[in-house]
From Swiss-Prot:
It comes from the Eukaryota. Belongs to the psbR family. Associated with the oxygen-evolving complex of photosystem II. GO terms for cellular component: chloroplast; chloroplast thylakoid; chloroplast thylakoid membrane; mitochondrion; photosystem II oxygen evolving complex; thylakoid. It comes from Arabidopsis thaliana (Mouse-ear cress). The modification Phosphoserine is found at residue 58. One of its GO terms (biological process) is photosystem II oxygen evolving complex assembly. Keywords: Chloroplast, Membrane, Phosphoprotein, Photosynthesis, Photosystem II, Plastid, Thylakoid, Transit peptide. This is Photosystem II 10 kDa polypeptide, chloroplastic. One of its GO terms (molecular function) is mRNA binding. Residues 1-41 form a transit peptide. It is found in: Plastid, Chloroplast thylakoid membrane.
Length: 140
């Protein structure tokens, strides 16, 4: 009986949907302020290379067309040598022949470096084997 009295006194009324345009404290604003400084490029920076990186300038296309069906213009990778000082492979080459060591016969770390490398590798392998053994049924 008490429950029916409470239910009759509580009624739900639908409320209209309204949006208030008040700024909440602590929340960032969606409007952006204009920056006080301007970034200006200083010009074209040419890459200095003795010879361009990459393959030769000719392009060997099957039936004379590329993958999209367009006829090749024959630029190859050397199109930008005069403009930027290097071809498209010259912007971030993987290696530079001028930075190679004189010979690859001797490890620069010497015998001590090889010994440290071997001990480290053996320790990693032994530690892995120990972990496998300790978590297996053989350790029980």
């Amino acid at each position: 009986m008490a429950a029916s009295v409470m239910l009759s006194s509580v009624t739900l009324k639908p409320a209209g949907f309204t949006v208030e345009k008040t700024a909440a404290r602590g929340l960032p604003s969606l409007t952006r302020a204009r920056p006080s400084f301007k970034i200006v490029a200083s010009g074209v920076k040419k890459i200095k290379t003795d010879k361009p990186f990459g393959i030769n300038g000719s392009m060997d296309l099957r039936d004379g067309v590329d993958a999209s069906g367009r006829k090749g213009k024959g630029y190859g990778v050397y199109k930008y040598v005069d403009k930027y000082g290097a071809n498209v492979d010259g912007y971030s080459p993987i290696y530079n022949e001028n930075e190679w060591s004189a010979s690859g016969d001797v490890y620069k770390g010497g015998v001590t470096g090889l010994a440290i490398w071997a001990v480290t590798l053996a320790g990693i392998l032994a530690g892995g084997a120990l972990l496998v053994y300790n978590t297996s049924a053989l350790a029980q």
